Amino acid sequence: LGVAEKVNDHITVSVGPVLVPQTHPLATVINENNAVFVTGVAVGETMFYGPGAGELPTANSVLSDIISVTKNIVMGITGNSFNDYSHEIKLATPDEVKNPYYISLIVPDKTGEMLKLTELFTNVEASFKLITQTEANEGFAKISIVTHAMTEAQLLKIEEGLKQEKDVELLAAYKVLEKG
């Protein structure tokens, strides 16, 4: 999912896997369809939805655009800008960007492992919204966690802490989409 958001007076942009709740309009996008979900003060929430293109039509369109732009530059007919308004905006820092996260781990299935996780999260002031444990391979358990909203900086500290733990494997850490 590609996401761009204004955070305070900064902007955050990202592209990557995101868990989308079944209740979110983006969860209805299926197969080769694409969607753009926009939230704005004047329009509220809107979604533009339609068929996407396969790899060959997309490549053909991109190549055609590149050829047209190159040709226009060489001929000196690039035209005038529609709008030359500009406003400098800086990227948000990891301390400013907040999201809930889904974290999946494999841990030794023994006493004290859940306590270690709780201490790690407590040390970075992050909290669990949902946590489940299921059996994995012999002697190990799979822990699935959904956190309350926390910063990217907190997530990085959690990931660093997990790397220090013997026999703990981080399988995934994905944003969870909560708006919509």
For each of these PLM feature ranges, what is it?
Residues H10, I30-N33, A53, P57-S64, ...:
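Conserved active-site and cofactor/substrate-binding residues in soluble primary-metabolism enzymes
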Residues T12, P17, A35, E45, ...:
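Generic secondary-structure boundary/loop-capping signal
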Residues I66-G180:
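A conserved regulatory-domain signal marking ACT and ACT-like small-molecule sensing domains
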Residues P25-N83, H87-P100:
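ATP-dependent carboxylate/acyl-activation modules
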Residues G2, S14, F37, M47-Y49, ...:
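Structured core elements
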Residues V18-P21, V41-E45, G52-E55, P108-K110, ...:
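Short, glycine-/Ser/Thr-/acidic-enriched flexible segments
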Residues L1-T28, N33:
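Substrate-binding/catalytic subdomain of NAD(P)-dependent oxidoreductase enzymes
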